[in-house]
UniProtKB/Swiss-Prot annotation:
NADP(+) binds at residues 205-228. One of its GO terms (molecular function) is GMP reductase activity. It catalyses: IMP + NH4(+) + NADP(+) = GMP + NADPH + 2 H(+). This is GMP reductase. Coiled coil: none annotated. One of its GO terms (cellular component) is GMP reductase complex. The gene is guaC. Keywords: NADP, Oxidoreductase. Its EC number is 1.7.1.7. Catalyzes the irreversible NADPH-dependent deamination of GMP to IMP. It functions in the conversion of nucleobase, nucleoside and nucleotide derivatives of G to A nucleotides, and in maintaining the intracellular balance of A and G nucleotides. GO terms for biological process: purine nucleotide metabolic process.
Length: 328
């Protein structure tokens, strides 16, 4: 096991001499699956975070996205429509029998999604390995992301099975209670788990869960993430799915976990909860702010491209960097 475990708020990155005149010279783009995207960030493939409208907006504007899998019957049309518009199709699948049929149907219809994410809570499993192999056999051109995992062994096995990228994070999310319900997961040490997994990986990693600030995106990149999946920071926008509500005089929107009873429609194997997120305005404003903050991070790292962040020094600050300042 690991000697030092730490999470996002235990780490500070150390500045290196700046080489840019202005942060606007810094390039936040990232290459992933043979395409270049504006930010190393992807909104979580959750029902309260993404829908077809947001997916289209992201794709049209050069951002990566992954559509959720909770309305399975809409996926075929979704892939067809996105590709007809000249946009990338990026979808999620589970591992049940009907998902095997769905992959075959895509092939029969002549549809190859550019990205397919196999997305289950405990991704280090034979079921996921079989699904990776199935997709690679039937739709060899699709870029396959598999998860979620939390160990180097899991990363190696899924890569070996044919996954093009792995998604790391078991239960660190804000509306995920896996850590409480089961005692398992990377909650509280997600950043160290990412570092541990990245050392074993030969393909890209998506860090998934536990991001609470824009600085955490830079920290994820430092410890090996190519993409960073974000839920709560993307919840509560104008465009976000769900109705605006008023609670205690505040404008809010619902945000719930993918394994919550609100998601499943039943109280069975519940490992997610629901919360209200204060209204945040428009999604494009948040994306712009993320980009600017990341540009600043790159300039502090002493470079002008995202990769500069990967080599900076860091310290582990065991008393939490916020010193009582609550940012979330």
């Amino acid at each position: 096991m690991m000697d030092v475990v730490f999470d996002y708020e235990d780490i500070q990155l150390i500045p290196a001499k700046s080489i840019v005149g202005s942060r606007s010279e810094c390039d936040t783009t990232v290459e992933f699956g043979g395409r270049r995207f504006k930010l190393p960030v992807v909104p979580a493939n959750m029902q309260t975070i993404i829908d077809e409208k947001i997916a289209t907006f992201l794709a049209e504007n050069g951002y990566f996205y992954i559509m959720h899998r909770f309305e399975p019957e809409t996926r075929l049309n979704f892939v067809r429509e996105m590709q007809q518009r000249g946009l990338i199709a990026s979808i999620s699948v589970g591992v049940k029998t009907e998902e095997y049929t769905f992959i075959e149907t895509l092939a029969q219809e002549g549809l190859t999604p550019e990205y397919i994410t196999i997305d289950i809570a405990h991704g280090h499993s034979e079921a996921v390995i079989r699904m990776i192999q199935h997709i690679k056999q039937i739709l060899p051109e699709s870029f396959v992301i598999a998860g979620n995992v939390g160990t180097p062994e899991a990363v190696r096995e899924l890569e070996h099975a044919g996954a093009d990228a792995t998604k790391v994070g078991i239960g660190p999310g804000k509306v995920c209670i896996t850590k409480i319900k089961t005692g398992f997961g990377t909650g509280g040490w997600q950043l160290a788990a990412l570092r541990w997994c990245a050392k074993a990986a030969s393909k890209p990693i998506i860090a998934d869960g536990g991001i609470r600030t824009h600085g955490d995106i830079a920290k994820s990149v430092r410890f090996g993430a190519t993409m960073v999946m974000i839920g709560s920071l993307f919840a509560g926008h104008e465009e976000s799915p769900g109705e605006m509500q008023e609670v205690d005089g505040l404008q809010v929107k619902e945000y719930f976990g993918s394994a919550s009873e609100f998601q499943k429609g039943e109280k069975k194997n519940v490992e997610g909860k629901k919360m209200f997120i204060e209204f945040k305005g428009s999604l494009s404003d948040t994306l712009t702010e993320m980009e600017q903050d990341l540009q600043s991070a790159i300039s502090y790292a002493g470079g002008n491209k995202l990769q500069a962040i990967r080599t900076v020094d860091y310290v582990v600050v065991k008393n939490s960097i916020f010193n009582g300042d609550k940012v979330y």
